Structures are given as C-alpha cells and as structure tokens.
C-alpha cells in the first residue's frame, strides 16, 4: 500500500452510522468519530448534544488516495446522508447533526464543490442540496464508547440505523450501491 496518506472529514448526522461505510473500504487506514466545527476545545458528547459548542458530530478518515481516492470518498459520503436536510439527519435534529464536508486543502474543496454540483444536477433529489462545504477546523476525538460503535454494539447499531430512517432512505435513493 502506498505510504501517501490524506485526511478527510465528513459530518453526516450521528457518527455511529458514518463509520462502517468507510471502514469497510480498501485503502482506509482508520475512521475516527469526533466533533468539529465549533468554538469549544475538547468538547464532550453531552456538550455537543446541548447545541452550545457549535460542533457537529463527524468522522475523520485517514486514507491512501492511490487506493481509494478522495472522489470515491465523496461519492460514498453522499450515499450515506440526506443532502437536502438542513435541520439535521433523519431522526437526529439540530445543528450538531447537520451534514457537511470539511475540506483540508484547496483540491478537496474543489472536488467537494464539483461533486455537490453533480449531485444537484443528477435529478436524484428534487429538493436543493444544502450540505455545507466548510474549511476543516480542529477535530476532537469522541469518547471511546462511540468509536466503532457498529462493531461493539451490532444489534443496537442496526436498530438505530433502521429506526432512524437512514437505512430506508439510502435504500430508496441509492438501491444496492
């Protein structure tokens, strides 16, 4: 595997549901659940959920771009969220659950904007694509019990993913992709 590594950061609602899709891909070194985009250093889960820190739940992905390029990460990201929802994601409401792409350099920004435009023009969604594209800010790793939740609590994870409406939405809009 290439020694070249890059970082990608995505907010897609509850971070429990954002780890597995990326974790299972070739060229992904690690996926960390955490918080970004806010004004408080080292926030806790409770603080972020209180909607007072400005952070969003997010995942930070260390990847090998020669194996799994950033463009593919973007494509996979769009397939995990409702990009037309400005109030959160699925059952999770509030600013801490709003979707966003946090770019780490100009190339990522350019690719993110182009992918958003392609999605808007694709006709998959009739409503406008409202997912934010923002400059990456400090990322704070979430508490240990949130890391790889889908592996630690598979039944709870599956109930949540289905019960929140995420699984049905993804199936309806993306099929078996």
From Swiss-Prot:
Enzyme class: oxidoreductase
UniProt record, GO biological process: cellular response to oxidative stress; protein modification process
UniProt-listed HAMAP family: MsrA
Alphabetical UniProt keywords: Oxidoreductase
Record carries keyword Signal: no
GO molecular function: L-methionine-(S)-S-oxide reductase activity; peptide-methionine (S)-S-oxide reductase activity
Family: Belongs to the MsrA Met sulfoxide reductase family.
Protein name in the entry: Peptide methionine sulfoxide reductase MsrA
InterPro entries linked to this entry: Met_Sox_Rdtase_MsrA_dom, Met_Sox_Rdtase_MsrA_sf
Record SUPFAM superfamilies: Peptide methionine sulfoxide reductase (SSF55068)
Pfam families (alphabetical): PMSR (PF01625)
Gene Ontology cellular component terms for the protein in this record: cytoplasm
Function: Has an important function as a repair enzyme for proteins that have been inactivated by oxidation. Catalyzes the reversible oxidation-reduction of methionine sulfoxide in proteins to methionine. May deal with oxidative damage to alpha/beta-type SASP in spores.
Reaction(s) catalysed (UniProt annotation): L-methionyl-[protein] + [thioredoxin]-disulfide + H2O = L-methionyl-(S)-S-oxide-[protein] + [thioredoxin]-dithiol; [thioredoxin]-disulfide + L-methionine + H2O = L-methionine (S)-S-oxide + [thioredoxin]-dithiol
